């Protein structure tokens, strides 16, 4: 199993940072391979993504959600991938965001992509723009 983990410090309070990430339909704004995320029910979401120039669809399941602290998920189709994002207040105005992704796929760029997604998310939150 391939895994990557990185963290970044976002200049915003933990509640605001968590709230922004927890709007899962907005993931494509900073996870560049995702094209669309739609809520199926409280814990299931459909998604489409564009790896290697080929559109694919799948479903992911939220397996753990601790408000203000952590969100964990796993895919239900198209291979196995799981992830967890955690939010730790560093101060009133700074939050450490840690993202860990595990996958049966072995993309050489998984570590780079995790860093990229966190950087995109940081810009989205700190700049208040709709797209990172």
Predicted feature locations:
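Short, surface-exposed coil-to-beta transition loops
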Residues: 3-5, 55-59, 80-84
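Hydrophobic ligand-binding cavity/cleft-lining segments
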Residues: 1-44, 120
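Beta-strand/loop substructures that line and gate deep hydrophobic ligand-binding cavities in soluble
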Residues: 61-64, 70-132
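Generic structural detector for well-ordered beta-strands
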Residues: 7-11, 38, 48, 61, ...
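Short, cysteine-centered beta-strand-loop-beta hairpins and adjacent loop/turn segments enriched
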Residues: 52-56, 105-106
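Residue-level signal for tight coil/turn positions that link beta-strands
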Residues: 12, 41-42, 66-68, 92
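Ser/Thr-rich, low-complexity intrinsically disordered terminal regions
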Residues: 43-49, 54, 66, 72
């Amino acid at each position: 199993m391939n895994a990557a983990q990185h963290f970044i410090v976002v200049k915003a309070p933990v509640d605001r940072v968590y709230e922004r990430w927890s709007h899962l339909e907005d993931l494509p704004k900073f996870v560049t391979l995702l094209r669309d995320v739609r809520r199926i029910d409280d814990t299931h979401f459909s998604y489409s993504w564009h790896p290697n120039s080929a559109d694919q669809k799948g479903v992911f399941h939220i397996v753990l959600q601790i408000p203000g602290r952590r969100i964990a998920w796993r895919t239900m189709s198209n291979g196995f991938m799981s992830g967890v994002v955690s939010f730790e207040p560093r101060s009133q105005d700074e939050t450490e965001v840690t993202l860990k992704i595990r996958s049966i796929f072995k993309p050489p760029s998984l570590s780079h992509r995790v860093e990229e997604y966190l950087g995109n998310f940081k810009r989205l939150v700190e700049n208040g723009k709709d797209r990172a």
